[in-house]
């Protein structure tokens, strides 16, 4: 790390965060603290299998990658809608754990900065509405805002 670079911490897990990470990767040392509440699409399928979905972690690592060719491969999707990178991370995760999967994939992608999950456990985002109703799941909460 160059000493003249600023250290910036980004917290989140949506499309905007990944665009910010990509824009900052050559201008600062970036630590990305990534939400683990994604439950849509392939992440929802992984959750049903009791696997912590690494989708947003993958996107953050790709955004911070200094290996653009491999990063592009990681984003290619199979017929079920899973990104190749998700398959790779889950494969390592099931054998060695999520932390080791992040470490190994970060090395292969030549990630500049750090990608840190907010938790290593399966979690569910919930929201309490003004009327006291509790909504569970990121996708259900997102629907309320559209």
Predicted regions and their residues:
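Gly/lys/ser-thr-rich phosphate-binding loops in alpha/beta enzymes
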Residues: 1-51
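Electropositive, gly/pro-rich neighborhoods at or near active sites that engage anionic ligands
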Residues: 35-145
């Amino acid at each position: 790390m160059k000493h003249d670079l600023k250290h910036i911490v980004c917290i989140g897990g949506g499309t905007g965060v990944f665009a910010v990470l990509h824009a900052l990767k050559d201008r600062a040392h970036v630590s990305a603290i990534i939400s683990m509440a994604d439950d849509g699409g392939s992440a929802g399928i992984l959750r049903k299998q009791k696997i912590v979905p690494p989708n947003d972690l993958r996107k953050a690592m790709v955004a911070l990658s200094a290996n653009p060719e491999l990063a592009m491969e990681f984003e290619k999707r199979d017929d079920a809608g899973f990104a190749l990178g998700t398959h790779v991370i889950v494969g390592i995760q099931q054998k060695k754990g999520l932390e080791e999967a992040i470490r190994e994939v970060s090395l292969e992608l030549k990630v500049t900065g750090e990608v840190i999950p907010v938790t290593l456990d399966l979690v569910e985002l919930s929201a309490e509405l003004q009327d006291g109703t509790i909504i569970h799941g990121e996708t259900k909460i997102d629907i309320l805002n559209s």
